[in-house]
Design a protein with these regions (language model features):
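Interfacial segments at transmembrane-helix termini and the short loops linking adjacent helices
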Residues: 102-122, 248-251, 312-341, 387
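Hydrophobic alpha-helical transmembrane segments
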Residues: 116, 120, 150-198, 368-372, ...
Length: 415
C-alpha cells in the first residue's frame, strides 16, 4: 500500500476526528477558558507519559517486527506474547506508582479536589490504554488499515460526546474525569471491534515470554520513552515559565496554539503512523532515499497550503475553534506555523531512525530539540515577550532539521 493510498484511507478517519475535535475544543474553550486549557494540558502531558511508560515504549518495535514477520506464525507468536506480557507487567507497576504518589501528582496537575477516587480510575485507565495501544500496534504492523480507521473513528466520536457532556455538567472537574474515562472506553471499543473482525489469532498473545525479542523491543523502548519525556518536560518548563512570567492566559493561549497545530497536522500524522515505520523497515538504502523524497513531494505542498490557509483565516479559526479570550495567539501564530512546516519534515527523517533502530541517534536528537527549545525560549521570551516563544519554536526546528539532514547525509545527499 503506497503513501497516497494510505493517506486516502486515513483521510476518512482524520476528517471525522478533526470535525469532532473542532466541536469539543470550542466547547472546552468557551466553558473553561485559557485557565482550563492550561490545566488540561498538564493532565494530557501526564497521560501521554503514563501511556508510554506503561507499555515500556515498545509500540514502534511491535509495528516493525509484526510487519517483518507477519507471515511467520512462529516468530509472530514470540513477538506478540512477549509484547503482551511486557505491557501487562509495566502497566501494573506504573499503576501502583500512581496510587502511591497520587498526592505529588495531584500537586503537579493542580488538582484541588479529593483525588483518591480519581487516581484509582486513572490507574485503571492506564492499564486499559496500554492494552489498547498494544492491539493497535499489532494491526498497524500487519496493515489492517480499515479496522485501524474504524476503531479511531468510533473511539473519537464516543470520547468527544463524553467530554462535552461532562464539561457542560461539571466544568473543569468533568473534563479531568472525561480524559481518563475515555481511555477505558477506547479499549472497550477496540475489544468489541476485534471480536467482530478478528484481525489475528488472539492465542498468539498467550505463549511464552521470549528474552531475545524482549531485548530487541527494549531498544525501541528507549526511543519511545525519550521522545515523549523530552517533549513533556520541555513544554512543561516553557508553559510554567509563561505562566510565571505573565499569567495563565498566556500559558493557556500557547497551549491552545499547540491544539490548533494538532488538528491541522492530524491528517499527516495519522498517515505517518500507519505508513512510515512498516514501509521504511523493509527498504534498503537506495529505495529508502527514493521513498523519502517521494513523501516530501507530497507532504511539503500539503503542509504549505494548510499552514497558509490557517494563517489567512486565523481570526476566524480562533473565534470558531476557541473564543475571543484566545486572541493572544495572533502574536505567535506566524512563526509557529513556519515551525510546523519544518516539523512535519523532521518527523519523516525521525521515522528513519526509528525504523532502523538507530537508538543513540534518536535519543540524541530528542534531547537536542528539548534543550535548545527550553534555552531559546527562556532568552527569547525575556528579550521579546510572548512572541519570543514562537521564535524559539521556529529556530529550534531549523536547527533540528539541519542536524538530522547532516546525520543522514550519506543516505539522502551523497551519491
Amino acid at each position: 500500500m503506497n503513501f497516497i493510498r494510505t493517506s486516502l484511507y486515513s483521510g476518512v478517519s482524520t476528517a471525522i476526528s478533526i470535525l469532532v475535535r473542532l466541536i469539543s475544543n470550542k466547547i472546552i474553550a468557551v466553558y473553561l477558558g485559557t485557565n482550563g486549557i492550561f490545566l488540561l494540558g498538564q493532565l494530557k502531558d501526564f497521560l501521554r507519559l503514563s501511556n508510554v511508560f506503561s507499555g515500556f515504549g515498545i509500540e514502534n518495535g511491535i509495528i516493525k517486527y509484526t510487519s517483518e514477520f507477519q507471515k511467520s506464525e512462529g516468530e509472530l507468536r514470540k513477538i506478540l506474547s512477549t509484547s503482551f506480557k511486557v505491557h501487562i507487567f509495566f502497566s501494573l507497576i506504573f499503576c501502583i506508582l500512581i496510587l502511591i504518589f497520587r498526592n505529588t501528582i495531584a500537586e503537579y496537575l493542580l488538582v484541588d479536589f479529593d483525588s483518591t477516587f480519581y487516581f484509582l480510575i486513572l490507574s485503571i485507565s492506564v492499564i486499559s490504554f496500554s492494552i489498547h495501544t498494544l492491539l493497535m500496534s499489532i494491526i498497524n504492523g500487519i496493515k489492517k488499515i480499515k479496522l485501524y480507521v474504524t476503531i479511531n473513528v468510533v473511539s473519537v466520536v464516543i470520547s468527544a460526546i463524553l467530554m462535552i457532556t461532562l464539561v457542560l455538567k461539571y466544568a473543569i472537574i468533568g473534563a479531568l474525569y472525561a480524559l481518563i474515562i475515555n481511555q477505558i472506553i477506547t479499549l472497550l471499543v477496540t475489544l468489541f471491534l476485534f471480536y467482530i473482525y478478528k484481525p489475528f489469532n488472539f492465542n498468539l498473545l498467550f505463549s511464552n515470554f521470549n528474552i531475545n525479542y524482549f531485548k530487541k523491543l527494549s531498544g525501541f523502548s528507549i526511543m519511545a520513552i525519550t521522545g515523549p519525556t523530552c517533549l513533556i518536560i520541555s513544554t512543561f518548563i516553557v508553559r510554567y515559565y509563561l505562566s510565571d512570567k505573565f499569567d495563565t492566559n498566556f500559558a493557556g493561549s500557547w497551549e491552545a496554539m499547540w491544539r490548533i497545530s494538532a488538528i491541522y497536522l492530524l491528517f499527516l500524522i495519522s498517515t505517518f503512523k500507519f505508513y512510515l515505520i512498516p514501509t521504511f523497515s523493509k527498504l534498503n538504502s537506495e529505495n529508502l532515499k527514493k521513498e523519502v523524497f517521494k513523501i516530501w513531494k507530497v507532504v511539503i505542498p500539503i503542509i504549505i497550503v494548510i499552514t497558509t490557509g490557517v494563517y489567512l483565516l486565523r481570526d476566524i479559526i480562533i473565534t470558531v475553534l476557541l473564543s475571543n479570550e484566545f486572541f493572544l495567539i495572533n502574536e505567535i501564530i506566524f512563526l509557529h506555523l513556519l515551525g510546523d512546516i519544518i516539523k512535519i519534515n523532521c518527523w519523516v527523517l525521525g521515522n528513519i531512525l526509528i525504523s532502523k533502530a538507530d537508538t543513540k541517534a534518536f535519543v540524541f536528537f530528542q534531547i537536542e530539540w528539548s534543550v535548545i527549545f527550553v534555552i531559546l525560549s527562556y532568552f527569547l521570551i525575556n528579550a521579546y515577550g510572548f512572541w519570543g516563544v514562537s521564535l524559539a519554536y521556529f529556530i529550534t526546528y531549523v536547527i533540528h532539521f539541519s542536524l538530522l539532514n547532516f546525520h543522514l547525509r550519506k543516505l539522502l545527499w551523497i551519491k
